[in-house]
Amino acid sequence: MKKYLISFLTLVLPFITFAQETQETGIDQQIDKAFKPFSDFFSDKIFFLVWKDPDIPFVLVLLVFSAAFFTLYFKFPNIRHFWTAISVVRGKYEDIEKHGATILYGEDGIAQGVDLNKVDDIEEHIDNIESLHSDLEIDGDIKETIRDESSHGEVSHFQALATAVSGTVGNGNIAGVALAIALGGPGATFWMVVCGLLGMSTKFVECTLGVHYRDVGEDGTVYGGPMYYLTKGLKEKGFKTLGKVAAVLFAIFCIGGSFGGGNAAQSNQATIVVKELLGWESTAAGFWIGVVIAFLVGIIIIGGIKRIASVTEKIVPFMAVLYILCCLYIILSNFSLLDDAIALIVKEAFNPKAIGVGGVIGVLLVGFKRAAFSNEAGAGSASIAHSAVKTKYSASEGLVALLEPFIDTVVICTMTALVIIIFNFGGFFEYGGDGSGSVFIDGVAYEGAGITSIAFHEFIPYSKIFLTIAVFLFAVSTMISWSYYGLQSWKFLFGRGKKADLTYKVLFLIFVVIGAAASMKSIWDFSDAMIFA
């Protein structure tokens, strides 16, 4: 621990010196000025257009059509296997792992209709089983069930889901939704939901592949993700060189994504709400908030995936439920406006009124872009976390993964959107704003999480305090998960040694500070580019 603390202080001290030297011009402005050309370069290169007026980037078309293809090819797994996925996460099959199929279920267990949930003493029940019904099993497994044999892996299905959800449920749900509505109007919500439903199939595919082609180290540590399934999968198909090149490119951009959308964008939004709550107008406020966040994240990410799973398993359900309850309170308190809000979402999805959105295609692109950023379906990042699950049945974890876009986009993003739309029935701002994502409320410019914050404050007294805490928790949990994604890609490129680990973590913490200090536009342009790449 001491050496990590020394490394962190070595990282921070030069920034402190730089901060003292730039008090007059403002360190936040200096960092933003230095970072903007870097952000613009990547944004221009990644989002090259296949069509102009409206602008349609190739990468967005690729993601959407891939999701539609997987949905049709696998016959709507997002609908047919939804309840099976919930059963796996709930641990329905844990008794099978603990006791074994041949012992747990026999003629007295299933054939005679005994409900094991109502058995007083399951151990006594097992002891009393004298005969088995062989027709119920195939190679020791019960028919029509999924068995978690724990042959390899580090975490449970639920922990893998929590780690991955914490990477998707973040400020894309709070700030991203507000940005989508500010730019595209209420209709953007409809297309976000559509993208989320299609994205469930994409998550199913990429996480199944992640488990199927994962590597297991000599010490039992699991390494997985697109860099592994691209290499192995394409090699099996006779495209060895293409697989290696694709894997290296993914690893590079995944590292970029961990610095951008999974890091800088999160600290950026956390800083915005903290500054607004505290009324901190200092030209170095973002920098110092970033230093604090970097310190907290640095302590957590030293633990590795097992500690990340432990932390996110506790944080994610709590913050998601609390945030949803607040959204529900606002929505139900204004229940008479709910049907109007839903009608407006559907109407403006096909007949948008937002200033400068560019018609149906424009609002569709806004919704799809923000949904893809929020749930990361197609980005491949979630398969890194899911590859660490304890199972030898890859498809079972694919089923678990398809729940993520539903939780993230269909549920949480939609609730955020309804709160903002109901709030704006009071005519507080014009949809479309100035075209940059900012809107003016009572003459004051608001953007991202700031829009959501003022909407909450209208209905819940002192909600700015709650939302600041929620944004902060979402940000930290997302950064924790993305640090793991980026580190796995870093190890793929540079090896699995301790020095490689430390180098990545130092760079990761630097981007926490950059994200907090730089402007929202620069950070989100860079983040979008890295996630979509």
Q: Where do the PLM segments sit?
A:
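N-terminal alpha-helical transmembrane segments of multi-pass membrane transport
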Residues: 2-164, 183-186, 533
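Extracellular/periplasmic helix-exit of transmembrane alpha-helices
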Residues: 21-22, 206-219, 327-344, 352-354, ...
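Transmembrane-helix boundary/entry motifs in multi-pass membrane transporters
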Residues: 89-99, 141-161, 196, 207, ...
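Selective recognition of specific alpha-helical transmembrane segments in multi-pass small-molecule
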Residues: 195-206, 289-305, 316-336, 369-370, ...
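Extracellular loop-to-transmembrane helix junctions
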Residues: 53-81, 91, 182-221, 413-415, ...
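Helix-loop-helix module between adjacent transmembrane segments
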Residues: 70-71, 165-166, 195-220, 231-268, ...
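Alpha-helical membrane segments and immediately flanking helix-loop junctions
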Residues: 108-180, 218-233, 255, 359-406
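Membrane-interface loop-to-helix entry segments
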Residues: 3, 70, 74-90, 246, ...
